[in-house]
Design a protein with these regions (language model features):
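Generic recognition of cysteine residues
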Residues: 181, 211, 217, 299, ...
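A short linear-motif detector with a strong N-terminal bias
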Residues: 119-124, 294-295, 301-304, 385
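Generic detector of short, locally flexible boundary/turn motifs and exposed helical patches
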Residues: 97-108, 279-292, 399-402, 441-444
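N-terminal pre-transmembrane cytosolic regions of membrane proteins
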Residues: 1-275, 529-552
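Generic hydrophobic, helix-prone segments enriched in Leu/Val/Ile
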Residues: 1, 53, 79, 127, ...
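Hydrophobic alpha-helical transmembrane segments and their immediately adjacent juxtamembrane loops
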Residues: 2-7, 430-552
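N-terminal extramembrane/targeting module of integral membrane proteins
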Residues: 256-377
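Membrane-associated alpha-helical segments
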Residues: 344-485
């Protein structure tokens, strides 16, 4: 086994893992642009374990620690407004200028008991946080689960990073075990009671669900953790419903404090940085050619050196994962107020969250555009109207997302700036932003051109009515306005004469509007000096010929 080929010194003195899973939220109020899903969680209902977490700025200033201050000043002012809300003076209302990000936490889950493979002893990880991150005006929620344990062999740490964050199995082996998943995962309460157990081995459950719904089914322990949020395709009742929007492997952060991080082999770093299965020291998870540029593309080695042992820290990032490896005896790496440990749980967690929030929000908007196109029935006038409203709504949401949430730079601190750029580059958020922007702009341009076309048609119809109405106006004006002297007639007779004139006038105007397109073609032909008289006459007779016209 891989464990037998590992040096006994490769122990992780403190291991910490944060899973961050973006999900798309379904509307709870049809027609409303802004869906405040968190308001449902604010209501005290039976079976709702979530409560809102107030940030450090709303509590007692005496509880405001140096790590909170360091986190705050790391970010640029526009990012601070996103994370913490607008700056305010004493006496200002708390709700005014509040952060557009809302955090909810459940505290009934105290530990995770994991069995990697059948026959292995279970491993119990402490649960630090289970949080949900909501964002104003964006129908995306991020589930964050933070676990930790001390004194863990490196091979097991690699396996936990690789296997733990799986929403459902990718397949099954010959024994019926879920591929690349934990053999068993359990959520435990503070008293040790089992709250939920994974069901990766239930092959028929996943196959039948995918066949019936054309969507994957979540493992039981992850579905439990999200309740009262429920999977949109499931038969389970729930007001807040979600859909998978990214890969079933949850983005992951890892913190590994080693006795001597310099003893890790190149294969160890590749397995950690690319989050692959555990292996031997000598073996690489991929071919030499495939990982030839690993250090250049996936490592941030600002403080990784033989000469600077106290600050020997290496960061690994592939977009899907952000891993920090350092010395367990280095205060710079382990200090809980100012060290890398604090930065990992605060600054780096937030920049990792923002990068994945950007990607999830863009994917959500793109998905909504595709959904609007799929619902469009071009021969149904009501469907066309709904399509136009949906596109304009997504255009407005995208504009608000751009101005409220989208930024290329989060910090001017060199390390935070570099790590965010590395993460965003691997996630491809800049290219995705341009792609979604182009999609929305193309649809918006089409709707604008269609609106101008309809306005031009309306002007044309009014012009036709005015042109042919001018004939009657000239005739009555030439012959005199008072063709019928009825001023002294009885009132009833005058009313009847008025109606006698009104009805055919309205009918004639409506007839001109109905025939306005054909009449405009006749007027255009009439003004064309190149057409012979017979062709112009044929154009006039075409006014009364029936022809099939496409829906516009």
């Amino acid at each position: 086994m891989a464990e037998s080929n590992r040096a006994p010194s490769k122990q992780v003195r403190h291991f910490r893992q944060i899973l961050l899973w973006p999900l798309q939220l379904m509307p709870i109020r049809e027609g409303a642009q802004i869906q405040k899903h968190w308001e449902v969680l604010e209501q005290e209902r039976e079976g709702n374990p979530w409560h809102e977490v107030l940030d450090e700025f709303t509590g007692d200033p005496g509880e405001f620690k140096e790590r909170h201050y360091n986190e705050f000043v790391t970010f640029l002012p526009h990012v601070q407004r996103f994370l913490y809300g607008e700056s305010r003076r004493a006496g200002d209302e708390a709700e005014r200028g509040a952060s557009p990000m809302r955090v909810f936490r459940r505290e009934d889950v105290a530990a995770a008991r994991l069995t990697r493979q059948a026959g292995d002893p279970p491993l119990t990880l402490n649960v630090a946080h289970v949080d949900l991150y909501f964002f104003f005006d964006i129908d995306v929620v991020l589930l964050a689960v933070e676990v930790f344990v001390d004194d863990l062999p490196l091979v097991i740490a690699e396996d936990v990073l690789y296997r733990f964050g799986r929403a459902y199995p990718a397949g099954w082996d010959e024994e019926g075990e879920g591929l690349h998943c934990m053999h068993k995962a359990e959520w435990l309460s503070a008293e040790g009671a089992v709250l939920a157990v994974s069901d990766y081995e239930k092959r028929d459950k996943y196959l039948s669900f995918a066949c019936r719904h054309r969507a994957p089914c979540l493992a039981a322990h992850w579905a439990f953790l999200l309740r009262p949020l429920v999977l949109d395709h499931a038969d389970e009742r729930g007001v807040i419903r979600y859909r998978q929007i990214e890969y079933y492997r949850m983005p992951v952060m890892g913190y590994l404090a080693m006795d001597n991080p310099r003893t890790l082999s190149r294969g160890d770093f590749i397995r950690l940085g690319l989050v692959t299965a555990a292996g031997t020291d000598e073996a690489l998870p991929y071919s030499d050619r495939h990982v030839a540029d690993f250090e250049e593309n996936f490592c941030y080695d600002r403080y990784w050196s033989d000469q600077v042992e106290e600050r020997n820290t290496r960061y690994l990032c592939c977009g899907h994962a952000l891993i920090a490896v350092g010395g367990a005896h280095s205060r710079v790496f382990t200090d809980r107020e100012t060290g890398v440990f604090s930065q990992f749980r605060h600054q780096y967690f937030l920049l990792f969250l923002i990068a994945h929030f950007h990607k999830a929000a863009l994917l959500m908007i793109s998905d909504r555009l595709v959904d609007a196109l799929n619902r469009l029935e071009v021969h149904n006038a009501e469907s066309v109207k709904r399509f136009k409203r949906a596109i304009r709504q997504q255009f407005e949401i995208f504009l608000r997302f751009t101005h409220r949430y989208w930024f290329h730079e989060l910090s001017d601190q060199a390390q935070s700036k570099a790590l965010y750029r590395l993460c965003a580059r691997h996630l491809g958020t800049d290219a995705l932003f341009e792609e979604v922007q182009d999609e929305i702009q193309e649809m918006s341009d089409y709707l604008d051109s269609d609106s101008l076309r309809r306005q031009a048609n309306t002007v044309m119809r009014l012009t036709i009515v005015t042109t042919f109405g001018l004939i009657g106006t000239l005739c009555t004006g030439f012959l005199g306005m008072n063709l019928i002297d009825a001023a002294d007639n009885p009132l009833l007779e005058r009313v009847l004469l008025f109606l006698l004139f009104l009805v055919p006038s309205v009918a004639l105007i409506l007839y001109f509007i109905v025939k306005s397109k054909q009449l405009s073609e006749f007027l255009e032909a009439l003004s064309d000096e190149r057409l012979p008289a017979r062709a112009k006459l044929r154009t006039l007779t075409d006014v009364w010929r029936k022809r099939q016209r496409p829906f516009t």
